[in-house]
Each structure stands twice: as C-alpha cells, then as structure tokens.
Amino acid sequence: MQYVNGMDIVKSVYDEVKYLINYTTMPWTDLGEYEECSVQSIENPTEEGLIFKCIGEINTSPEIPLNVLYNANLQQIWDELCIESKKIEQLDSCNSVDYYSFGSPLGGAPRDFVFLRNFSVDFENKSAWVVIRSIHHESIPSPTYMKPSGWEFLQISPNKTRITLVVQINDLTIAPYLRINSVDLKRIYRNTGIQITHTLPNLIKYIKKNYKKEIENNFKKFKTPDLFNPNLNNNNNNNNNNNNNNNNNNNNNNNNNNNNNNNNQQQNIKNSNSNENNNNNSDSITNSNSNENLNEKDGKKILLPQLSEEFEFLDVDEELYDVDKTPTFMFKETSKTVGELEVNPVETGWNCFRKFNDYTFYYRDYDENSLDFACSGSSFIDASAEVIFSYIFSEYSCKIDQWTCGMKTLKKLDQVTSLERMSFRSVLAPKDVLSAVLVKQVNYFQKGIIFLGYRSLLKPSTIVKTGFWYSPSAYYIIPQERGCIIRYILKFRMYLPPSTYKIYPKKQILYVISEKTRATVEMIKYYSINPFYLHKRKQQEFPHWEGIDKFSELAEIFSNIQIRHSKPSLIINSPPNSNNHENEKKRKFRDNGINSTSISIPSTQFCFSSGGGSGGSSSSSSSTSSSLTFSPPQQLSSPTSSSSSSTFSNDSALIDNNQQLDINNNNDQEYLRFSENWESYITRKPFLLLISSGLHLRKPPKKKSPRYLESHNLKTCSLFDLLPYEMIQYIFTLMDATHLIRMSRTCKYFNRICLDDNIWRDLYNREFTKNSSDSLFKWSSIEDINLGTEKKQLLDLTFDHSKKKSNNSSPLSASSSSSSPSPPLLPPPPPPIPQLPDMLLENNNKYNNREQIQKNEHYWLNMFREKETINRHWRAGNGKVSNLRGHKGKISCLQMAPNQIFTGSKDKEFKSWNIATKQCESTTRCGASSVISFEKDNFTKLSTDIFPYCLFMHGIIRLGCSNGAIQHYNIATKEIEKEQRFLYVSNGFIFMKRDIYSYESNTVKLYDSETEQELQMIEIENTKINHCKIGRFENFCMIACTDKTVKLWDIDSNKTELVLNGHKGSVNCLDFLNDYQLITGSSDKTIRMWDIRNPSSAIHNIKSHSSKVKAISIYNNLRMCTGDEDSICLWNLEGSNEPNLLTTINNLSPVECLSIDDETMLAGFSDGEVSYYDFNSK
C-alpha cells in the first residue's frame, strides 16, 4: 500500500475513458436502439466482462447535461433505476466522492457504488468530460467494483450535443443476484446492458422535460438554474401559472386554492377527462364522483378522495400518502426490500422462519401490536409474459389469488400508476371481508421485462382499522427464450396485538399465511400454463371460504392438505364442502370445550427470535457534520412506536419531495461553465489516495503516525531514515516471522515497526487463511474472526449456505481446477462473529477471554503466536488430555460446541459436558434405545463452519436413536421437547435441515421431516452398510460397505453412479478431503485416498495402522486424525499430495469415533471414556 497523487489517478482514468470513446477501430457489436439512443458492446480484452457504449443527442449546450451530472443528488430523480445518490465528499471543484445505489430490473439485490468522479472541460475540442472510478470509502461497506467509465459531451453544433456513455462491467456485476442461476438472465445482461441502456435516455428525457428558455436566461447571469435544484418538483409546472397562484395567494386565499386544485389536477392526473373544464370551482369538483381533488397543504400535494361510494372509508386526508411521484418509485422501494431480504436479513431484523423449494418466508416484530411478513422467491413458468401478467391484479385474481376476493380499478392516474380497490379475506376471521386501496405501478423495461408493484395508499397508522398494510411489493416477469421467470417480493404488515397470540400461536398464524402465499403463486403458475382450465371453474375449490368461520379451522385445513406442484387446484386431503348446519354443529362442539382445538402443524423448521429480531433492531444514525461520514436518508417515523422508527426503511416511499431529496445543502452547489475560461471559476486542491494492490483505492486515514516514530531519538543511521513510514512498513510485510524477529533485535526503531499489529495481521492472513474454505461456517476458527464487534443479531442459519453451489453441478463432471480455490489478491477483512445465546456464554469459557486479547495493541501478534503454538503442539502430539468419564457403554457419537461437548453412548444416555470444567452438566435418558447420530455429525468440518446447534431452531438439536426415533433436544432446558418417529430401526442418520437420511442393514432411505414421507430408497445387494456421508454435493451420498467397496449414490436418479474398489477388507469409515477427494479407512489396516473423478484406483494407499481403522475425521483439508483399536494417528494434509504422518497417540481402548477442529480433538472409546485433547495449552 502506498499514497499516490489523486490527480495522477484521475489522469489515468481520463486517458482510458477517452481511448474507449474515441478509438474507432474497436470491433463494437451493435445491440440496437433504445429510445433514440444506440447501444454497443464489446468483450473486455483485459478481464472477463463487457464494455458498453451508449450514444444519444440532445438540443442543448454541453453545459446543461454536465451540470446535471455534477449534482450527484439529482441522479435519484432522473435515473429510473437509481435508488439513492449522494455526495459523500467534495474534494475540490472538479473532483468528488459520491455514493450510488442501483436497483436491478431482474429483481436482484441493489448494487452500491462509491465513485471518484472528475469533471473537466476541453473547450478547444468543444467537449466536456465526466470520468468515474470505483474506490473504497470508510463510510460505505463492501461496495461493488466497476472499472473506469465515463461520459463525453461533444458539441456538434451551437445548440446540439452528442452524449456518449461508456461503462466497463465485469462478469461478477453482470450476473444477477438471484437464486436461479439462469443462463438466460446473464444473456440479457450481456446482450443488452439492461441497466446501462436506461441511464442516458433517462438523462435526456429529464433535461428535455425541465429545460426552458427562462432557464437559458439564467445561464447568462452565471446563476445556478432551478433545473439543478433537487427540491424542484419533477412535474412540468408552468412558471407563469405558479406566479399567478402566488399572487392570488396574496390577494385571495380562496381563489388560490381553487387555482391550485385545477392546475395540479391537470399536471398530476394525466388520464383525466380531456373535456374537463379548468376553470371550474372547487364545488363542481367536489360533486364529481369520478375525480379526485388535489389540494395544496403545507407545501405538499396530497390526495383528497371524495366521500363517495368508492372512497367512503378514506375520509381522513391526514392518513393518505402523496401519489405524485416518479414512474418508478415503486420499483425503487421494492429494490430496497430485496436488499433487506437477500443481502442482510439479520441486520434489518428479519427472521427466516421457513423455506420450501423456491420460497423463503420471513417475519419480524415491528412493534408490540404488529408484525411484518415477507416472501421472496423466483420460479420458471412456461408461458408468455402477457399471459402471466393477466392473472396478477386483474379480474381473475379472485379466482386464483387465495388472498383476494375482489379487485376493481378506481382511477388511472397516468400510463403507469393507478389506484386499485382490493377486497380480501381476513386470516383470523376467514368469513370477514376487508378492503384496501392500493397504488399500483406497471413498468415495462427493455427485453419485455414487466414490473408490477403495489402498496397501500393509506399510511401505516391505519393498520388498526384495516388489519393489513401492504408495503412495497412486486412481481418481476422476465421473458426467456422459452417461457418466463417470475420473481416475487411480497411484504405486508399485520395488526396482531399480544392478546391474539393467547388464542392463536404466532407459529400457526405464520404457517397459514405462508401456505396461502405459496398457494397463490402456484395457482398463477398453473393457470398461466393451462389458461383454459380457469374458465371451467364454476366455484372456488380452495380453501372453501364459505364453510370456514374461525382461524382454527383454517389452520387445520392447511396443516393437513398438500398442494401439488403440477396441479395446485387439486388439493390432496382437502375437506369436503360441508353444509353450514354441519359446520355450526362442529363449532358448538368445540366451543363447549369437549374437544379443544389442537392444530397439527407439519414439522416445518421455524426459527423465532426471542424479542431481538424485531424491526427495531436495525438503526440508522442521522447525518453528522462530517462530510466523510455516510448515513442513509432519514427514515419515516413509526406511527405507533418511536423506538422502531429506524426500521421503517421501505415505508418511506411516498414522502414529500422536500423531505426525500433535501440531502445536502444546495445553496453552495457550484456550477461548471462550458467556456474558454471555465477554470477561472473553480478551485483546485491536491488530494491523496491510498492504493492497495492496484485494484481499489482507499481514502487515506486521518490518524497520524505514532509519536514514537516521529522522535528524533529513534534512528537507524541508514537509508531507512530517508524513507516514509508507510514504505518501511510495506517492506516489513514481505518478511516472514523469523526475519521479523531478527529485524526487531537490530535497533529500537525496527523493534517498534516490527511490533506494528498491521504487519502481523497481513502475515497472519498470508500464512493461515490461504486454505480456508468459504462455503460454510465454523466456530472453531474463532481466531480468524473479529471479536470486537459486539451486540450482533443472532445469525439465522435457516439460510442454506450450501446453495452457493449450482443444483445441477455434479462432482463427476467438474473440472479439476475447481477443487483448489485460488487465494484472494487482498486479505479480506475479518468477518464479524454473531452473538450467541446467553445460555451458551460462560465466564469460565476460554473463548470469552479472546475479546480482552483483541483490545491489546498486539492482538494479531498474539494470534500469530497462538496459531504457531497450536501447529507446534499438533505436529508433536503434545495436546493437554482431559478424560470425560460417565458413560457405561461404548461411545457411538460425539460433537463439539463453542463451550460444550455432546456425547451419545450405547448405554442409552445422552450427556452434555462443560469444556472449561470438564464436568457433565446434564444426562438425558433416551428411553430403551441409544443415541447413534447428532445433527451435522456426518458432515465434513471446514474452517469457517460455526457450530450449528446453538444457532438453529432456538438451540434445538436432533438426536437419532437406534429404534428409529428422532428426538429434539433443547440445549437451554436440557430436555427432550419433541419426538418424531417414521421408522423403527436404524444404524445411523444424516440430518440436512428438512431431509433426513437413515441407513440400516443394506438400505439407505431419504425422508421428508415435515411430511414424514419416504422420498427415495436404495438397496445394495450382498453387503452391509457401515457408514454414510454427504459432502459438498447434496445430491450425492457416499456409502462405505462391508464388501470392501465405497459406493456413490445419486439421489436424483436413485442409482449407484460409481464404485471404488481397492480395499481388501470391510470399509468402516470415510471423510471428504475436498469437493472431489475422500479418504477411507478399512479393516485391512490401511487408509486410502480417492478422487471420484478418476475412480479406477486409489491415489494413495497408506499403511500406518496395526489394526483395523475404525474412525476418520478431517478438518479444513489441513489436518486429519485416524483411529484404530490401539492408537490415534495425527496427519498433516497441507502442502503435500500425500498425507504426512506427524505422530501417534497410543490408547488403552479401541477408538469408536473422532472429531477435530483447529485447536482440539475429541476421541470416543469402546469403554465409554471420552478424551479431550487441547493443542492450544501453553
């Protein structure tokens, strides 16, 4: 890292952008025209990605578009896809650091950018330039990177400008942030530059809309025109009318109100009747039932509906939002919701309580009386976009949508926005019909993409009256070469006072709502493919609204029915449509207390927070006086609770323009002149940037160098005295630990530098994080995690991190290069560790002292020493041994937690041990069977894997028993809360969230834990199964058999794909080394290494054991331990293709199971003893 002159960086960016625009021999590919702008693209010759160029013309001077771009706050107004734009810091008159956030037309998560922007005028060549480059800034975490890009404004005639925009985008930015890894979605980006093609046309439309001759007159006076004021109303307001209105306001308030009503009605409701008389007074407008009345109140336009039949319940104007907004405000607000759910749901207070196929359901407690619900997902529908669109918010909604029983268009405000009146059934009282007025927007993007967004017209404070408040939600319909992908983001708020939960548990309410939402999407998919079936339906088959009166009946239906994916209209286990007389008898029977309501909810994995997951958990600080501190715009305050106001981020969609856009003080906004002496009106200031590895730029820190380095007494009497501290520090970062220690002994100056914690941090990342995996989480690498961040939300592990892989990927067809990840160019910052439940944090736990270590100025030095100590003890086998005694039978399974150890034995007991005291905390008797499997104990451990039990389902772990029972054990209460039983004998289990594998004798079966149904089964003839394991690819299961083979079971095809032959004895155990390699242990006293891409023979055959190998455990592809009847062998897997035996630990009893992490090892023996080896003991 080194400081560079900021203007040198700007000059290099300027030269690169100028080359891309003016070099005419580049083989550009013409992508067509979009709104009179031509779009071209070319493959980036220097890296994977594309370069897009968009060209258009406008009849103005270059000065106008140059200054529109100069005001960064304006882009969120004129750019339809820009969610937020803000100036972070003005370096000088021509250079600034600005923040931008852009939504994705494909429904992906928003992308944040921090740009260093430079403005210049080349008046000799009649052109002006804006060049940008991505940088890092301390106020914006993890922005998206974009290569140098920019604009050219070329004056081709006295009042005509050609605008050229060139943007370099890499493949990572091109790829949409969706769960579906669709090649067609990426092709849309590559073939159209869909986000780039909107920018220039939007700029041209904005200038044409607001550019008037009155503004041209202001240019001659060198004043900033109102065009560049972000407080300017975006509508085409006639200045003369405004002046007349102001004069009328001074003369007669009544006349002023009448004029404002008429003028604003013309400006904001474009689809008004063409023969409407503009001179009608307010009384004539009030008497019209088909029109709304727009009044000016406190400088804000609000919609005042009339007390007519259509708007009889909207009689309070203070409860209405302003609908006079940009055509894509719904798209921008929905994009914020996507960012909340897809990027950081925990930090924004969301809890993922259920996953089902492509559906993910979230909730959060907004306040004590209301709850937010959200559903996110995407699906493929083999139908055209027009057909799919016709079933969403249309006359067919009441036949398809399980929420809606009526839909009517009240008013068409313009070509994009309309008001819809929706009638829907109540959840808690299904016979009741509620009504709501929604604001709906339909946007048509390039390539036929349709965006349909909606939200409630009323303010959230009316939730007490209606029971529901619809937040910005949307459907994205994305055409493909065949069919469409529909992306849905559904979010609303429910009024549920605490008294409701006493009658209907929250779990039941959320489950019913999730099933209703899923049924709606499935209906849209089904009838879009088979539209002729819809017209044959004479009545609603689902969910029998006419026969349901209470929520308990509705919950009972949803707990028993099964919605078929192929034909959702045919409901399995759906109750018949009984008459009202029979239903009334049942209700009286239940109300009398003879048979209390007992709802059987399927065993969906729910994860509720204990009060901490409310919307009030995320906070946004207000803007400060420092220009370097970035803070988001002020959020809309909660109407019911001031403590939760900061979470209402997406509910500020329709606030007034002044509140939303007044980000910076625009009185000091400079103005650039397109003239020969333009530089005389600006000021230049030098600035420095800190460049790191030539990739990203960082703003220089304001901290001064340590005082002791400035002392004249500390000198080396060498050339080092002439070098700046940053350069000396960089030189020292290239040394290893041995040379750093030697240099620290030469002089006091070098000693102080060698103690710099930044040097040891870089050395630590270089030495110990190069082989770490990034696919899962693991607690054991706590030293790689920044423990300084406190009070973090509880991490919701219902998010399936294994989905980072492609569902269609196969280990048999993957390339060999994918097995070894390349190290990052820059050491990533340490990720924050989530806060664990209080029940798992103890004062005597050794991990609690790590936070005190980090506060030390030599934190990374101490961490490096600790890591070296662990490696040294591991190589020598000198771990501190603690024996855990208490079991009376052989150990069948064991697992480590942050401060606990769990063990299961053949003595039919399950024990929990405290790591610090090595004492048994609790003993649970598992009936007449023994515990044989834990949750996650059949998975390979990686360096980033966090212990799953304490974070999953409120500290619930599943225990597999030999009699086939699955018991749910609560770590906090140390009791069995629930028991499932859908098989009667088992030798082992593999738990994978909803899927459960069980093997016994010669069969392996796959069950659905929610429905308790058998999904797949494979039977292997003439052998017995000893062990099963699943690696990175969840659709492949490795099976160790007594016939001396290892078989790979393809779960999708239910076939044995390959067989590994080579062992001369029964294969007893196996573990995965990486994605494609595994190690097996056999009764022939050998361990073998295999590569399933080349299964003909083993890679290595290692003979180091004196008896049959019974257990194997691998940690992070770095270390391995194997156990037989007499000893435990420790192996090093780093830096060599073949495992390297480090040491052998002799034991008095045969080993039954092993488990290791970075610092410790657990061994369970046949005599019931458990040994705990701590390699970090000094």
Curated annotation (Swiss-Prot):
Annotated START domain residues: 1-208
Protein name stated in the entry: F-box/WD repeat-containing protein A-like protein
Cross-referenced Pfam families: F-box-like (PF12937), START (PF01852), WD40 (PF00400)
Lineage: Eukaryota, Amoebozoa, Evosea, Eumycetozoa, Dictyostelia
Entry-linked SMART domains: FBOX (SM00256), WD40 (SM00320)
Ranges of Low complexity composition bias in the record: 229-293, 571-580, 809-820
Biased composition, class Pro residues, residue ranges: 821-835
Domain F-box span(s) in chain numbering: 717-763
Single GO MF descriptor: lipid binding
Function of the protein: Substrate recognition component of a SCF (SKP1-CUL1-F-box protein) E3 ubiquitin-protein ligase complex which mediates the ubiquitination and subsequent proteasomal degradation of target proteins.
